[in-house]
Design a protein with these regions (language model features):
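Conserved ATP/PPi-binding loop(s) of AMP-dependent carboxylate-activating enzymes
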Residues: 362-365, 376-408, 446
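Conserved AMP-binding/adenylation subdomain of ANL enzymes
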Residues: 211-233, 237-280, 295
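Conserved pre-ATP/AMP-binding loop-to-beta segment of ANL
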Residues: 38-41, 155, 160-161, 171-192, ...
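Conserved AMP-binding A3 loop
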Residues: 53-58, 188-215
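Gly/Ser/Thr-rich phosphate-binding loop
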Residues: 252, 279-284, 293-354, 367
Length: 476
């Protein structure tokens, strides 16, 4: 937890990590609240038709226990990988919590993935089970006979050929479950990230990754939790940003999270959604925020209760920063990190750490520098690679089944982000480009190799090369 200080330098000096000997994400974000304040709201589910359903921590605890017992009854054991292909809904945190309680490893998969992307990730992770919704049945059916380790498929909203109805199965199971004793470095989740060479890599994180995010969450959201705080993001909860910048930290603090499923992001309705629900804290990637700015009508800010906004995944930019400050009355706190090591640089306007055009400064608890090719720290104003020093609880355990790539990610104790940047005399970091061919589009990092492989699989294509094209809205 952050020290309650208004001075950044004093905050950094006073901060100390407090990682317990045993820690389980599932019990930390749900069980302890279900035991101490069972009727406290955990999830607020809203539909476009206007219906709203509140889910308490007690309900979430019972459902997650039923899910855990169901998975265990089908042979899921500690260390097994369980994939999730789920939208924003109450079942998504319940499934995550169940997996963590089992001591298994959650493998979140984005709803936008096509069959090829799903096939690679399911096979590479050696996933034994998949939890999804029935609208992904078509994608699954086209690859099912090539999934070598997948034993069971569950749907949260029905059934189908070779698909079990998770709600029906869970209804037969006990709503009590004794979580496994897990340690901070025990694997908890694996999120796939794209690189410039080769296929996507699974970044494996321990249970401590949630604790590693907490100071950054408090810093960026301006001293979360405050009375009536209520969190939302348009980002898929399968991405590190949606999962670790919003969903799990919000539950950890006992705060409600808004679950709303956009089939396609609607920036105009996003303003309506914020006003109708009273969201106070939001993670909105720059592309989505630019779209919302373009869709803002004359009275778009009427009824808004926003207190804090964080944004990242791509550069926010000076114009967007100034617009938010002038029109929303809220300064966007830019954040920076990667799937492998998230939320290590950011702004906090509440204590004066905010400068349009810059990311911000190192989050208390993290050592970040700009280094040269030899691993030496660069002087202020000199360009180099943004790097994070280990050990750090937010840092990944390594790439799944890829020890060489894990070794290549480091120079000594410095994790190389692959992002080029500078730090000025005041300690503000700025990002100005990648040192590889990764494409940044709407906050997503896309490896060209995966797209090239897809293109050349077509009989009419012999060779393919993919590069990013500058785009004013989406970056590339």
């Amino acid at each position: 937890m952050l020290p309650e200080l208004n001075d950044y330098s004093a905050m950094r000096r006073a901060f100390r990590w407090q990682i317990p000997a045993q820690f389980n994400i599932g019990t930390a974000v749900c069980t302890r609240w279900a035991q101490t304040d069972p009727q406290r709201t955990a999830i607020v589910s809203k539909t476009r038709q206007g219906s709203t359903h509140n889910v308490s921590f007690d309900q979430l605890e019972r459902l997650s226990n039923q899910f855990a017992n169901t998975l265990a009854a089908h042979g899921v054991r500690r260390g097994d990988r369980v994939a999730l292909l789920l939208p924003q809904s109450m079942e998504t945190p319940a499934a995550h919590i169940a997996i963590y309680k089992l001591g298994a490893v959650a493998v979140p998969l984005a709803m936008l993935f096509g069959p090829d992307a799903l096939e690679y990730r399911l096979n590479n992770s050696d996933a034994v089970a998949l939890i999804m919704t029935t609208d992904s049945s078509g994608k699954l059916a086209s690859i099912r006979d090539r999934l070598t380790t997948l034993r069971f498929v569950f749907a949260t909203d029905g059934t189908g050929p070779d698909i079990l109805d998770l709600q029906n199965e869970a209804g037969k199971a006990s709503d009590r479950f004794c979580a496994e004793d897990t340690f901070p470095d025990d694997p908890a989740m694996m999120i796939y990230t794209s690189g410039t060479t080769g296929p996507p890599k699974g970044a494996l994180h321990g249970h401590k990754v949630l604790l590693g995010h907490i100071p950054g969450i408090q810093f960026g959201y301006e001293f979360l939790p405050q009375p009536d705080d209520f969190m939302w993001t348009p980002s898929d909860w399968a991405w590190a940003g949606g999962l670790l910048n919003v969903l799990l930290p919000s539950l950890y603090f006992g705060l409600p999270v808004l679950a709303y499923r956009f089939d396609k992001f609607d920036p105009e309705y996003a303003w309506t959604l914020l006003a109708e629900t009273g969201v106070r804290n939001a993670f909105i990637p720059p592309t989505a925020l630019k779209m919302m700015r373009a869709a803002a009508g004359d009275d778009f800010a009427k009824g808004l209760k926003l207190r804090s906004i964080i944004s990242g995944g791509e550069a926010v930019g000076r114009q967007l920063q100034e617009w938010s400050k002038d029109q929303l009355g809220v300064r966007v706190n830019e954040i920076y990190g990667q799937t492998e090591c998230n939320l290590v640089l950011q702004s906090c306007a509440a204590i004066g750490i905010w400068r349009p055009g810059a990311i911000g400064k190192p989050t208390p608890g993290h050592e970040v520098a700009v280094i040269g090719k030899d691993g030496a720290v660069m002087a202020p104003g000199e360009a180099g690679t943004i790097a994070i020093k280990r050990p750090d609880p937010v840092m990944f355990l390594g790439y799944w089944k890829n020890e060489q790539a894990t070794r290549d990610k480091f120079i000594g104790d410095w994790l190389l982000t692959g992002d080029q940047g500078i730090v000025d005399d005041d300690g503000y970091f700025s990002f100005f480009g990648r040192d590889d061919d990764v494409i940044t589009s709407a906050g997503f990092r896309i490896g060209p190799t995966e797209i090239e492989d897809c293109l050349i699989s077509h009989p009419a294509v012999k060779l393919a090369a993919v590069i990013g094209k500058p785009d004013e809205l989406r970056t590339e």
